[in-house]
Regions:
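Membrane-interfacial terminal anchoring regions of lipid-handling membrane enzymes
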Residues: 1-355
């Protein structure tokens, strides 16, 4: 996030290898390091961190953020395709056009050609699921506020959320999908023609195959987006939040809510296609008895604090508006964490049908 590249924090981020999203040389640097294999890159496929986790609308990937809605960006796919384009171009022209190869090696600061042309480019889908998600002030957010003048609200929110995860303790489930080899998408005639073209092609020069590569990037994006969100690790917060969102009655007894989540949990355990948090792999009978892990109590406490629920005469009154009203995108995880939690499992059709 370019908003973090200010003051003392900017120097630190540059030293550890982070690149601002507004760095004019960003794409060439990424392609160069992918060609040489000196670095791998972590890229948000949505184009930015989706704090509200709202990435599906009417069955299609659609990102909702402070500026409106848009399909997921194809940045990761485009960079992977551009990398493999130049790798194949170097391989193809190594003997036929040595002067062009020399130019490209200089452009990308490549010292040795052999390792570059013998590598391949992959996209590895990765999913990180945090449990529980609770945003609050912490030592990291306080420190950043002192180091950076006028720290942007969105950066502060990220530090409050991620900082709390690191300091207070949180389970992080990391899942890696099958690597996607970038290669087949470059085999159409028009792209092949540009790869073997003998004319000089500078990094930002327009090429005839630009439209074809754009289409391939869109297909590639759909592939890894599906893989990423299908790897979400389902936890009890997801079930409670989804159950509360879809609850058709306006009020409910706490015991009834817990029984519904218990039933959903036992059914979810039978779905082989879902990834479950360790707590969901065990018998959830505690939801019906003493709630000895405090999971139901903690969820309901948060729901009451954030206004999703009100408690009247031992009954829980649901405020449906908290699941449908617009809210500040950059404060989503602070102001409405339950909506964020429910959004995170929206792409999982098996779970949605069960709930």
């Amino acid at each position: 996030d370019y908003g973090l590249f200010t003051g003392a924090l900017a120097g630190y981020l540059e030293k550890v290898g982070a690149v601002s999203t507004k760095d004019p040389d960003r794409d060439r640097l990424i392609v160069k390091s992918l060609l040489t294999g000196e670095a791998n890159w972590i890229i948000f496929p949505e184009g930015r961190m989706v704090k509200n986790k709202k990435i599906v609308e009417k069955g299609q990937f659609m990102i909702s953020w402070a500026g409106g809605k848009h399909p997921p960006h194809t940045g990761a796919a485009t960079l992977a395709i551009r990398t493999e384009f130049y790798r194949r171009r170097l391989r193809r022209l190594a003997e036929e056009k040595p002067d062009e190869v020399e130019y490209l090696m200089d452009l990308f600061q490549i010292e040795s050609l052999e390792p570059v042309i013998n590598r391949h480019t992959y996209i590895v889908p990765v999913n990180l699921t945090y449990y529980p998600i609770r945003a609050r002030e912490n030592i990291l957010s306080n420190l950043a506020s002192r180091l950076v003048d006028n720290l942007p609200d969105r950066a502060l929110e990220e530090l409050m959320t991620e900082g709390s995860m690191l300091i207070s303790g949180v389970d992080i489930d990391i899942r890696f999908g099958d690597p996607i080899l970038i290669g087949e998408c470059l085999e159409c005639t028009i792209i092949e023609s540009d790869i073997r073209a003998e004319r000089r092609i500078n990094f930002d020069d327009p090429v005839a195959s630009k439209s074809a590569m754009r289409k391939e990037a869109l297909k590639l994006m759909q592939l890894y987006m599906t893989d990423i969100y299908n790897m979400t690790t389902v936890n009890l917060d997801h079930l409670f939040a989804s159950m509360l969102r879809f609850l058709r009655v306006k009020q409910i007894d706490e015991g009834d809510l817990r029984r519904r989540v218990f039933l959903a949990a036992t059914r979810i355990q039978q779905h082989a296609g879902l990834h479950l948090h360790s707590s969901l792999k065990e018998d959830p009978i505690h939801l019906l008895t003493d709630d000895r892990f405090g999971i139901a109590d903690d969820f309901i406490t948060i729901a009451l604090e954030k206004g999703n629920l009100q408690k009247v005469n031992d009954r829980l009154i649901k405020d449906q508006a908290t699941f449908t009203s617009a809210y500040d995108f950059h404060r989503a995880r602070i102001d409405n964490p339950l909506d964020v939690i429910a959004n995170a499992v929206e792409p999982l059709t098996q779970l949605q049908r069960t709930v």
